[in-house]
């Protein structure tokens, strides 16, 4: 085998191999571009939904916004918070409050809508059977569906010369 080239030994072993293909990064310009893009997105959403998402106030337009207090929301949408206190928004536990709320907005105005699930421990006295195993009381067994159940396949005609 040939010896390694001398150029490979010029790179110190402790340095990273990093290439800047398009020159140095201007952090200020990058921040300005991101801010301009974000402002454009906020303005587009404001015009589309007639709602100011920065100050969280409804605007005049095609939509009529009204406050929903959560009394009609199912408890599925009212997650349990770290505190045990009840909330006046829907009867569920009070959602966790975030310190990142905008200044000037009340914490009571926010309702955190998220889903939560609880894992149930497997009981050792009842072994888990496979869904298709005999003796399970699941009712009718569903079969595996395939794409041709929804889309009918078409036969393709292939014309070829016959062998003599």
From Swiss-Prot:
Q: Where is this motif: Nuclear localization signal?
A: 141-156
Q: Which domain of life is it from?
A: Eukaryota
Swiss-Prot/TrEMBL GO biological process terms = cellular response to amino acid starvation; cellular response to cell-matrix adhesion; cellular response to gamma radiation; cellular response to UV-B; DNA damage response; DNA damage response, signal transduction by p53 class mediator; fibroblast proliferation; heart development
Processing after translation: Phosphorylation of Thr-145 by Akt or of Ser-146 by PKC impairs binding to PCNA. Phosphorylation at Ser-114 by GSK3-beta enhances ubiquitination by the DCX(DTL) complex. Phosphorylation of Thr-145 by PIM2 enhances protein stability and inhibits cell proliferation. Phosphorylation of Thr-145 by PIM1 results in the relocation of CDKN1A to the cytoplasm and enhanced CDKN1A protein stability. UV radiation-induced phosphorylation at Ser-146 by NUAK1 leads to its degradation. Ubiquitinated by MKRN1; leading to polyubiquitination and 26S proteasome-dependent degradation. Ubiquitinated by the DCX(DTL) complex, also named CRL4(CDT2) complex, leading to its degradation during S phase or following UV irradiation. Ubiquitination by the DCX(DTL) complex is essential to control replication licensing and is PCNA-dependent: interacts with PCNA via its PIP-box, while the presence of the containing the 'K+4' motif in the PIP box, recruit the DCX(DTL) complex, leading to its degradation. Ubiquitination at Ser-2 leads to degradation by the proteasome pathway.
Gene Ontology MF annotations: cyclin binding; cyclin-dependent protein kinase activating kinase activity; cyclin-dependent protein serine/threonine kinase inhibitor activity; protein kinase inhibitor activity; protein sequestering activity; protein serine/threonine kinase binding; protein-containing complex binding; ubiquitin protein ligase binding
Q: Glycyl serine ester (Ser-Gly) (interchain with G-Cter in ubiquitin) cross-link located where? A: 2
For this chain, the annotated S-S bridges are: none
Give start-end positions of each zinc finger (C4-type). 13-41
Record-given protein name: Cyclin-dependent kinase inhibitor 1
Q: Which residues carry this modification: Phosphoserine?
A: 114, 130, 146, 160
PANTHER family linked = CYCLIN-DEPENDENT KINASE INHIBITOR 1, CYCLIN-DEPENDENT KINASE INHIBITOR 1-RELATED
Please classify the protein's predominant subcellular localization into one broad category: cytoplasm
Spell out the subunit comment: Interacts with HDAC1; the interaction is prevented by competitive binding of C10orf90/FATS to HDAC1 facilitating acetylation and protein stabilization of CDKN1A/p21. Interacts with MKRN1. Interacts with PSMA3. Interacts with PCNA. Component of the ternary complex, cyclin D-CDK4-CDKN1A. Interacts (via its N-terminal domain) with CDK4; the interaction promotes the assembly of the cyclin D-CDK4 complex, its nuclear translocation and promotes the cyclin D-dependent enzyme activity of CDK4.
Please list the residue ranges that the record marks as compositionally biased, kind Basic residues.
Answer: 153-164
Q: Where is this region: Interaction with TRIM39?
A: 152-164
Q: Does the keyword Disulfide bond apply?
A: no
Report residue spans for region: Required for binding cyclins. 17-24
Compartments reported by the entry? Cytoplasm; Nucleus
Residues the record lists as Phosphothreonine modifications: 145
